[in-house]
UniProtKB/Swiss-Prot annotation:
GO cellular component, one term: plasma membrane
Enzyme Commission code: 2.5.1.145
Matching PROSITE patterns: LGT
Broad class of where this protein is predominantly found: membrane
Regions crossing the membrane: 24-44, 64-84, 99-119, 125-145, 187-207, 211-231, 247-267
Associated pathway: Protein modification; lipoprotein biosynthesis (diacylglyceryl transfer)
Gene this chain is encoded by: lgt
Any one Gene Ontology molecular-function term assigned to this protein's record: phosphatidylglycerol-prolipoprotein diacylglyceryl transferase activity
UniProt protein name: Phosphatidylglycerol--prolipoprotein diacylglyceryl transferase
Keyword Protein biosynthesis: no
Length: 291
């Protein structure tokens, strides 16, 4: 006989104010945005980290966070529709807009973030790679909170585990089998571990090389996601794909190549040259991070 950990049943509503109900996943988004904004402001205040003035002002950062947030939400929903449940949404197109029912994709959200960063930088004449560094430096905060919300909601649980595994647990909607708490594995790898590695890199001067933090985030996230997928139950509407691979694995594999390519570019360009910061510099090329 093995003693399994009892999954703590949580109320899906985190905060209830009369007719307004805030669910855990929404709270994770709000918390991720606020904590990410605070961390980004702290990074921008230190000229030592950048080797000179930061690439964006505090005032511009507020607008930047808004653009990135919109990109993540639109991209995350679009990615889920296209990658994970296209047949369903073709039959029920109106439900595409019902995001409060759940259904977001990291890979779609990341692509939406990339588009938002590029558009914002082109509009304001700011360096794309350096602002990509800012966005991805804070990314693990939101990833950690999002995975914790997945655990609280008893969703995206893991594959069946050996009953002798001390932390195996039975999820309310996961059947009678003990399972890996894969949400906590991913929260640790994609959140805590990734944040720690990037923070140590930043402390060692990574922000002085535009794109180095961005490329490292992409590469390390993809590796962490693929590792986590070995313990995570595939989405029921998709199941296992070619050779036992999951959709998460297939979407993450190209990210490793892209991330390594960005790291090579960042390293070959060398440290950024100190520049005088301005509120708006439309005549500056967004393709250069060292001008």
């Amino acid at each position: 006989m093995f003693l399994l950990i009892t999954y703590p049943v949580f109320d899906p509503v985190a905060i209830s104010l009369g007719p307004i109900a805030i669910r855990w996943y929404a709270l994770a988004y709000i918390g991720g945005i606020m904590l990410g904004w605070l961390y980004a402001r702290a990074l921008l205040k230190s000229e030592k980290l950048w080797g000179g003035p930061a690439p964006i002002s505090g005032l511009q950062l507020d607008d930047f966070i808004l653009w990135v947030t919109i990109g993540i939400i639109l991209g995350g929903r679009t990615g889920y529709v296209l990658f994970y449940n296209l047949d369903f949404f073709i039959r029920h197109p109106a439900e595409i807009f019902e995001i409060w029912k759940g259904g977001m994709s990291f890979h779609g959200g990341f692509m939406g973030c990339v588009v938002a960063v590029i558009l914002f930088c082109r509009k304001h004449g700011l360096p794309i790679l350096s602002l990509g560094d800012v966005a991805t430096a804070v990314g693990p905060i939101g990833l950690f909170l999002g995975r914790i919300a997945n655990f609280i909601n008893s969703e995206l649980w893991g594959r069946p585990a050996d009953p002798s595994l001390p932390w195996a647990m039975v999820f309310p909607n996961g059947g009678p089998l003990p399972r890996h708490p894969s949400q906590l594995y991913e929260a640790t790898l994609e959140g805590l571990v990734l944040f720690t590695i990037l923070a140590l890199m930043i402390r060692a001067g990574a922000l002085k090389r535009p794109g180095l933090v961005l490329g490292s985030f992409i590469t390390l996230y993809a590796m962490a996601r693929i590792a986590g997928e070995f313990f995570r139950e595939p989405d029921p509407q998709l199941g296992f794909l070619w050779g036992g691979l999951t959709m998460g694995m297939l979407l993450s594999a190209p990210m490793i190549i892209a991330g390594l390519a960005i790291i090579c570019v960042a390293w070959s360009r060398g440290p950024r040259a100190p520049v005088a910061q301005t509120i708006s510099t439309p005549d500056v090329s967004t393709k250069a991070d060292r001008d």
